[in-house]
């Protein structure tokens, strides 16, 4: 098959959408498919490099940190992709590259598949002064996007239920993003531990991801005074970095909360390997790829209760979910004082196995073939009706 993936972001940007899309591309190519990508450039120039077409874009950081919007006059680049005539178009984002994805799918007579990666109602603080109004706008926007597609992929049952509640009418299939699991099986890097000044006599809690308001990292930092035998390693960057650093100074935790900033994607497994547990206070995850990465690295989870964790965390077996700060403190002590950390690690690795990148691509391939067949049948029925008329 000829498969076009469209995404507003691409490498070297590091986020869940890029991780999912690059994993998809790599695995589909390994199965013999021809895969191209349509994304935004980081400037106003439109160009192509190998199998990736970059559309000129404009800075939209005032709307959302790091965001860009598609520029005008892109017909030449789209005509070239239309001549290539993909068998299926798989959109990953709802904004700048969604309209080109629709155009190219129509031009090729191909099905348009869309993966819903982001729970926009959890991001209302970026675009609406009222959370209630923001939720209504998010539902309206999501419905208008998804109902223009032939099928929608939801990474978890949580997202499928959300979409159906919004009134999405097209077929919605649950398909968790997969990971290259063996990538996270790396030994602990003692030299890296020393460079980060992590004390040998303390347990290491890890948060890895964007530093943004919806991730509620301040809750994790605020409970660190109750865990004197642990340090918190915060890997990543984002718009909340400055506010979180100020909170650390206010709580006098500079020696027990370590910020690394952004790290190269290839180094990420080594940061997981430094930790004893992965901690998160986010309730805005569509799937939570970092949760899967942590499990693949053998880290038990210590995460805020969220429907995306259903069937992923077995309480006390591969981690714990918590519902309030008091529970977080109590369960942190429970986890870090367990006398069977090797059992926790073994259970964590085992629970990540069903989420392999190979299984992810195989399921996507099956969905593509089904939608291509359905599109072909619809076209044949329409042609027969025209002849009869």
Task: Tell where the protein language model's regions lie, with residue ranges.
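Conserved acidic donor-binding segment of nucleotide-sugar-dependent glycosyltransferases
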Residues: 315-326, 334-339
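Donor nucleotide-sugar binding/catalytic pocket of nucleotide-sugar-dependent glycosyltransferases
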Residues: 39, 53-56, 135, 139-188, ...
């Amino acid at each position: 098959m000829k498969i076009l993936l469209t995404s507003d972001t691409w490498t070297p940007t590091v986020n869940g959408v890029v991780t999912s899309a690059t994993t998809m591309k790599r695995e589909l190519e390994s199965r013999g498919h021809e895969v191209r990508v349509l994304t935004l450039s980081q400037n106003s120039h439109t160009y192509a490099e190998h199998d990736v077409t970059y559309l000129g874009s404009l800075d939209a950081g005032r709307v959302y940190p790091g965001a860009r919007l598609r520029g005008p006059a892109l017909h030449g680049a789209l005509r070239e992709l239309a001549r290539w005539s993909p068998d299926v178009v798989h959109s990953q984002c709802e904004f700048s590259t969604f309209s080109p994805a629709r155009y190219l799918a129509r031009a090729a007579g191909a099905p348009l598949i869309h993966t819903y990666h982001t729970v926009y109602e959890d991001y209302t603080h970026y675009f609406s002064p009222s959370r209630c109004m923001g939720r209504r706008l998010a539902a309206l926007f999501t419905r208008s996007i998804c109902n223009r597609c032939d099928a929608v992929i939801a990474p978890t049952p949580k997202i499928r239920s959300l979409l159906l509640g919004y009134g999405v009418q097209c077929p919605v299939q649950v398909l968790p993003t997969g990971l290259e699991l063996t990538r996270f099986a790396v030994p602990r890097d003692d030299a890296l531990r020393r460079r980060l000044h992590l004390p040998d006599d303390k347990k290491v809690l890890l948060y890895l991801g964007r530093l943004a308001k919806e991730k509620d990292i301040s809750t994790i930092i605020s409970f660190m005074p109750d865990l004197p035998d642990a340090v918190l390693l915060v890997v990543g960057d984002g718009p909340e970095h400055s506010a979180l650093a100020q909170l650390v100074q206010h709580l006098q935790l500079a020696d027990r909360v370590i910020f690394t900033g952004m790290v190269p994607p290839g180094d990420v497994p080594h940061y997981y390997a430094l930790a004893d547990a992965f901690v998160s206070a986010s309730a805005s995850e569509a799937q939570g790829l970092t949760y899967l990465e942590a499990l693949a690295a053998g880290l038990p989870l210590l995460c805020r209760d969220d429907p995306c964790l259903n069937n992923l965390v077995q309480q006390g077996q591969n981690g714990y979910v918590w519902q309030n700060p008091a529970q977080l403190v109590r369960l942190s002590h429970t986890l870090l004082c367990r006398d069977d950390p090797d059992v926790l690690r073994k259970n964590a690795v085992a629970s990540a196995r069903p989420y392999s990148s190979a299984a992810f691509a195989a399921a996507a391939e099956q969905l593509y073939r089904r939608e291509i067949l359905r599109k072909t049948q619809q076209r044949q029925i329409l042609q027969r009706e025209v002849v009869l008329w």
